[in-house]
Design a protein with these regions (language model features):
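Short, flexible loop segments at the rims of nucleotide/cofactor-binding pockets, characterized by
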Residues: 50-54, 90-94, 199-200
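Extracellular ligand-binding/catalytic regions of CAZymes and related secreted enzymes
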Residues: 1-9, 113, 194-196, 203-208, ...
């Protein structure tokens, strides 16, 4: 049986630090991968995951429907819209290239499964710099992005509230209390018959949507407004047996396997 092809786009960054030691100082640069918990959770599963880090996605995310069509599900996680709009040919040389946000919309409309996972450069993101608001990708999502910084920082933590039917395929095999999360992106649920809010923040934290499922054309879309790893999603959540089950269920649903 063929595996479900999944493309994860984003979840990488480079940090630069200056270390001061009395009179002296030196610099260091560190490369980070943020999707390792998900990569590990899918090892040996029915899903074949290709991981396209943010810096590679700028010029390697396909520019054609044919290139995207090899995948059943595409995940956008912690990567801003500019990374897919400002290809070097555009940014450095003033040339035209296909608009990959429109391609992702059309690919989803034709039957693909599109997922956006939260983070500092997801939805609208920190300082509003993720910039997915009013884009073709936002058209596909079951939620609308805010036009400004949308972060919900909750250092005391919160436990998700299940708001949808526990019989939904995304909840299959997940039992008991969910672990604590530390933040999410604030979004607005679209008022459509196909959209279902499956989980939310507790009312004391605003009751904002956490897990939302919907349809776009012949495709399916999912918004998970928290992260897939630290810091918003702590290691206690990663180590929870429901973590791997949740993401396998989400991918199965988005790919229309269930």
């Amino acid at each position: 049986m063929a595996k479900t092809r999944v493309l994860l786009v984003g979840e990488s960054w480079v940090s630069s630090a200056t270390h001061y030691k009395g009179f002296d100082q030196f610099g260091s640069v560190t490369f980070h991968l943020g999707a390792e918990p998900l990569v590990k959770a899918l090892e040996g599963s029915d899903f074949e995951l290709d991981y396209l880090p943010a810096h590679e996605a700028v010029d390697k995310l396909p520019f054609t429907m044919e290139g995207l069509s090899v995948y059943d599900v595409i995940i956008l996680s912690d990567i801003g819209a500019n990374s897919l709009l400002l290809h070097p040919d555009v940014w450095l040389h003033g040339k035209t290239v296909p608009n990959r946000l429109k391609l992702l919309r059309d690919w989803t409309n034709a039957g693909g499964g599109l997922i956006m996972i939260g983070g500092y450069f997801s939805f609208q993101g920190i300082d509003g710099k993720a910039r997915w608001h009013r884009t073709p990708v936002e058209e596909t999502l079951p939620v609308t992005c805010l036009p400004y910084d949308d972060r919900l920082e909750i250092p005391e933590g919160f436990r998700p509230t299940i708001t949808g039917s526990k019989q939904h395929p995304i909840f299959a095999g997940i039992e008991g209390e969910w672990p604590v999360l530390l933040g999410a992106n604030e979004v607005i649920v679209k008022d459509r018959a196909d959209v279902e809010v499956l989980a939310a923040l507790p009312e004391e934290h605003g009751g904002h949507p956490l897990l939302v499922a919907g349809q776009f054309g012949r495709g399916r879309t999912v918004a998970w407004t928290s992260d897939i790893g630290p810091h918003w999603l702590p290691n206690t959540f990663v180590e929870w047996p429901g973590y791997a089950r949740l993401w396998k269920n989400v991918l199965s649903w988005a790919s229309k396997a269930v």
